[in-house]
């Protein structure tokens, strides 16, 4: 009799345990299912925010952001092509740093007034003496000097060589074909001198944060970009006070306005961000505020706007 009673109690206990497990599993599934609509709503809200900016500024946006600490991303037209404009200067200097030693950067490059193009704020002052590769990189990244970009591009073998080096680091998208300032004339549907937000983020990360360059050269590249003089109204204007930004801006026909950047919050790992934009008419003007406002949406989507 006692044996029968004990067996009955064991069966009841097992049934209760089984029911509890099923109930817990149901709760877990409910929690998972509950979080999915929330995430979907956040993504919908983010896309709506970007779409509103496009309508407000009469422009098209291409955005990709990567939080390198969590691998979270923000994407809006991340694989649509835009003229890369002067953002390519960051990747050009990245390849230069791959090919040249730190000592080689002291090599002096001579040039003439025939090498000056449409925007040469630094190189035009040094025609008589020439400039070192290091000085040219500084001029290209910090002042967006077009002659400096062209002289560096010639040093690494021209646009075709730049393209080959980008392919080696896994960038199958970015398509350099011309020198400054011709590279800024890109008509809708053309692929020459274009890239995507995702590709630019991936390549910038490879040069500045990963092992495509040794640490000493990464620090040099980042230092130049942190001291950029052309980006105060763009991504820098869209991040909270106290954050560090290393960026490279660009502008081209069809109201193209771009900025690619590495962003360091006070706490946490860097975010790599590309904000690309264009308009419908060839002679359209751009508005820097669009880039700043889009950056704010990215920060909100990454839950970093008040971090």
Curated annotation (Swiss-Prot):
Protein name (record): Beta-lactamase
Post-translational modification comment from the UniProt entry: Large exopenicillinase is the primary secretion product; it can be converted to small exopenicillinase.
Lineage of the species this protein comes from: Bacteria, Bacillati, Bacillota, Bacilli, Bacillales
Up-regulation conditions: By the bacillus licheniformis protein BlaR1.
Membrane-topology descriptor: Lipid-anchor
PANTHER family with a match to the protein in the record: BETA-LACTAMASE, BETA-LACTAMASE-TYPE TRANSPEPTIDASE FOLD CONTAINING PROTEIN
Reactions that this protein is recorded to catalyse: a beta-lactam + H2O = a substituted beta-amino acid
One cellular component term from this protein's GO annotations in UniProt: plasma membrane
């Amino acid at each position: 009799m006692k044996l029968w009673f004990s067996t009955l109690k064991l069966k009841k206990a097992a049934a209760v345990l089984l029911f509890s497990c099923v109930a817990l599993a149901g709760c877990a599934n409910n929690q998972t299912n509950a979080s999915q609509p929330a995430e979907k709503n956040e993504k919908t809200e983010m896309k709506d925010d970007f779409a509103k900016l496009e309508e407000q500024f009469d422009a098209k946006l291409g955005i990709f952001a990567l939080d390198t600490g969590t691998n979270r991303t923000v994407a809006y037209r991340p694989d649509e092509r835009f003229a890369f404009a002067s953002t390519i200067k960051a990747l050009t200097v990245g390849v230069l740093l791959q090919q040249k030693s730190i000592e080689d950067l002291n090599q002096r490059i001579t040039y003439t007034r025939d090498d000056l193009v449409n925007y040469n704020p630094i190189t035009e002052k040094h025609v008589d003496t020439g400039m070192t590769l290091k000085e040219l990189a500084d001029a290209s990244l910090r002042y967006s000097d077009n002659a400096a970009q062209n002289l560096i591009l010639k040093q690494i073998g021209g646009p075709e060589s730049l393209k080959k080096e980008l392919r080696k680091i896994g960038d199958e998208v970015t398509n350099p074909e011309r020198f400054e300032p011709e590279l800024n004339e890109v008509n809708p549907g053309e692929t020459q001198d274009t890239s995507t937000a995702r590709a630019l983020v991936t390549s910038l990360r490879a040069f500045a944060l990963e092992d495509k360059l040794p640490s000493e050269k990464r620090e040099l590249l980042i230092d130049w970009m942190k001291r950029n003089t052309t980006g105060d109204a763009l991504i820098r204007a869209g991040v909270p006070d106290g954050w560090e930004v290393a960026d490279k801006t660009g502008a081209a026909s069809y109201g193209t306005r771009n900025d690619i950047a590495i962003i360091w919050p006070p706490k946490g790992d860097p975010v790599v961000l590309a904000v690309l934009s264009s308009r419908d008419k060839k002679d359209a003007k751009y508005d820097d505020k669009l880039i700043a406002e889009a950056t704010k949406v990215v920060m909100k989507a990454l839950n970093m706007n008040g971090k």
